């Protein structure tokens, strides 16, 4: 919790407060691209179901899952090549040539939801194939973003929790409106489905002081990405599959490790 204490102390200093808010309150990382308006449509929770995600296994195609920043990266695919259950999964296909570099490049799978209460648990499965690391900061993660949260301070436009799943062992960059919680620090295992889960409500309570209430929407992103790639180092490649994604009460979690 010392990071939170230091952060709040800095925000009390007027000059630093303006700087911090200016560089670190984008929906993704400081200096990153801004999502095109209308790309993702917030969803009401499915009626009569514990899972807040619509189409969690991609058996009904891609919607209402969406992709952000299509000017930077291609959209996700619905694949029948590999699936944890059923016949389909979501595929993020990273293909970045060796000569390309940059601060960050993110391949996304996103759903936005508007539940009345903040959910308890996220779980699911990922699978990695063809992992070629083009920079030390190449990794998988999922991100939970709560927008317009009146009960959390400081008063950022959004409050985030970020969950690296594999590929990095240290925080990849500084961001004022997010905390990192590592679910894995090793290189990703390839050729097998890997289960993950996290009580996101407890994490918001621990790191932000309370679970979000009164928010306008939640955005959940499942990613493969890199940060700080130097041109000419190596190609950054991966095929990352996500399937059987769940967000809701822990007691109703349909997934098992």
PLM regions: where:
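Bacterial N-terminal signal peptides that target proteins for export
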Residues: 1-12
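C-terminal motif of bacterial Sec signal peptides marking the signal peptidase cleavage site
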Residues: 21-24
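Extracellular carbohydrate-recognition regions
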Residues: 27-72, 256-257
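Extra-cytoplasmic beta-strand recognition segments
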Residues: 58, 107-147, 197-200, 244-245
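Extracellular beta-strand ligand-recognition surfaces/modules
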Residues: 58, 124, 141-143, 190-236
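Extracellular glycan-recognition surfaces and repeat-rich motifs
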Residues: 58-94
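Secreted extracellular polysaccharide-interacting domains
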Residues: 92-117, 121, 173-183
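Extracellular ligand-binding interfaces
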Residues: 128-189, 241
């Amino acid at each position: 919790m010392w990071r939170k204490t230091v952060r709040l102390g800095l925000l009390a200093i007027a000059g630093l407060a303006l700087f911090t808010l200016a560089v670190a309150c984008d929906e993704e990382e400081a200096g990153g691209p801004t999502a095109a308006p209308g790309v993702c449509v917030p969803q009401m929770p499915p009626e009569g179901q514990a899972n807040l995600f619509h189409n969690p296994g991609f058996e009904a195609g891609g919607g209402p899952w969406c992709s952000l920043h299509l000017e930077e990266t291609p959209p996700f695919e619905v694949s029948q090549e590999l699936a944890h259950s059923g016949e389909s999964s979501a595929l993020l296909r990273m293909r970045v040539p060796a000569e390309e570099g940059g601060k960050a490049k993110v391949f996304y799978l996103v759903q936005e939801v508007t539940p009345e209460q903040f959910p308890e648990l996220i779980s699911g499965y990922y699978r990695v194939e063809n992992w070629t690391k083009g920079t030390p900061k190449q990794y998988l993660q999922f991100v939970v973003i709560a927008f317009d949260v009146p009960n959390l301070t400081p008063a950022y436009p959004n409050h985030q929790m970020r969950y690296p799943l594999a590929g990095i062992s240290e925080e990849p960059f500084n961001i004022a409106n997010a905390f990192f919680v590592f679910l894995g620090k090793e290189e990703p295992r390839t050729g097998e489905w890997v289960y993950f889960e996290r009580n996101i409500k407890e994490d918001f309570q621990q790191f932000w002081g309370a679970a979000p209430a009164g928010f306008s929407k939640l955005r959940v992103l499942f990613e493969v990405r890199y940060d700080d790639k130097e041109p000419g180092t190596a190609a950054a490649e991966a095929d990352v599959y996500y399937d059987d994604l769940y967000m809701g009460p822990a007691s109703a979690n349909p997934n098992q490790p």
